[in-house]
């Protein structure tokens, strides 16, 4: 990834990022700030008491707007005031298990939230490029051993996955109906890991909490295979898509899977064993299914389209991703300067 090219493109540009207070959103905000973008974020308050957004002090480095993506009137006012040139939509209710407990809220946020952002883009005279970030779970999951391709059927099972399938369809409809000349893409990313994720019911945060407390973590679905990748992998692709489709819409816009190579699609037990290796003393795990709601058992992405169109390939393998995650969390647990640690990891990633 050519960071100088990204900095040259984004420096001084008006960028609107929804979901900027979340795990991925905070990392992306940091990168855009390093690029010199005039960044506005639109999101609810951070989703957990301990969170990377506050740890990095991002609110002081950007125009951070507290708002609900379901509130169209407020979102319109932000668009009218900021006049964004580049829009990345990441705001979501992102947890599968929460979607079973709060299905209506999940659909309101993930479907109508997408309608609202697309409507603001439709009414805007300033937007030059738009990206909707969805998920690898948008596909009808057939528990197949081959990776899903972008033309496979969209039909997520649970309310979270299904709402993201709907978000894709909303984007496709707005593109065809209203935004034929505007560069519009969606990115369907795999499971991301990295420092700064403190969400519940996610495997690495659960491991960190267990390691810090000295208690073994419970692994619910040890054989579930996911396309795990470090958070920086998809984020730089998002920025590349937004930039390149603005420069050449016909060549670069589209719907793209973003995930690791097949060899890095590992099961939960392998991931936790790698975490144990990296963390060292004080961490252990037990395997015990809690009989929770349905989650996909086998999920891979075929990313050949992204590799062909963008010339992209993963930089990190899954064990590199674990090592970077553990490095970040251990630094945080020791009270180190996490802004400096985060910048260091970003720059080291770019130099690999």
Regions found by a protein language model. Give the residues of each.
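N-terminal Rossmann-like NAD(P)+-binding domain of SDR-like oxidoreductases, especially those catalyzing
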Residues: 1-189, 349
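Residue-level recognition of oxygen-bearing side chains
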Residues: 15, 74, 105, 112, ...
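Residues within well-ordered alpha-helices
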Residues: 28, 206, 302-303
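C-terminal substrate-binding subdomain of Rossmann-fold SDR/epimerase-dehydratase oxidoreductases
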Residues: 34-37, 67, 211-352
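Glycine-rich phosphate-binding loop at the start of an alpha helix
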Residues: 93, 97-100, 204, 300, ...
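Short-chain dehydrogenase/reductase
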Residues: 99, 190-191, 255-258
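NAD(P)-dependent short-chain dehydrogenase/reductase
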Residues: 142-147, 151, 157-160, 165-246, ...
């Amino acid at each position: 990834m050519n960071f100088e090219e990204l900095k040259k493109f984004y420096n001084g540009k008006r960028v609107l990022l929804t979901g900027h207070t979340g795990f991925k959103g905070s990392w992306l905000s940091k990168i855009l700030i390093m690029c010199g973008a005039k960044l506005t974020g639109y999101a609810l308050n951070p989703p957990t008491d301990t969170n990377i957004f506050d740890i990095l002090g991002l609110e002081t480095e950007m125009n951070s707007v507290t708002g609900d993506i379901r509130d169209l009137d407020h979102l319109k006012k932000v668009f009218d005031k900021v006049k964004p040139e580049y829009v990345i939509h990441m705001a979501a209710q992102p947890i599968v298990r929460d979607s079973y407990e709060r299905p209506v809220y999940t659909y309101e946020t993930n479907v109508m939230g997408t309608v609202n952002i697309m409507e603001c883009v439709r009414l805007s005279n300033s937007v030059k490029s738009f990206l909707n970030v969805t998920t690898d779970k948008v596909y009808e999951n057939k528990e197949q051993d081959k990776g899903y391709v972008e033309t496979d059927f969209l039909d997520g099972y649970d309310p979270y996955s299904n709402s993201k399938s709907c978000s894709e369809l909303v984007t496709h409809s707005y593109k065809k109906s209203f935004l034929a000349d505007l560069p519009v893409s969606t990115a369907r990313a795999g499971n991301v890991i990295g420092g700064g994720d403190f969400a519940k019911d996610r495997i690495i945060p659960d491991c960190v909490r267990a390691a810090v407390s000295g208690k073994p973590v419970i692994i619910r679905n040890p054989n579930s295979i996911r396309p795990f990748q470090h958070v920086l992998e998809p984020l730089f692709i998002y920025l590349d898509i937004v930039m390149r489709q603005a420069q050449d819409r016909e060549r670069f816009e589209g719907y793209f899977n973003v995930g690791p190579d097949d060899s890095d699609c590992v099961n939960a037990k392998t991931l936790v064993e790698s975490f144990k290796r990296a963390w060292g003393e004080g961490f252990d795990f037990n395997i015990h299914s809690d009989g929770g709601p349905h989650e996909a058992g086998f999920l891979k992405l075929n990313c050949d389209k992204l590799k062909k169109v963008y010339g992209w390939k993963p930089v990190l393998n899954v064990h590199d991703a674990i090592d970077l995650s553990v490095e970040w969390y251990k630094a945080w647990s020791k009270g180190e300067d996490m802004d400096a640690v985060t910048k260091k990891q970003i720059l080291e990633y770019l130099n690999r």
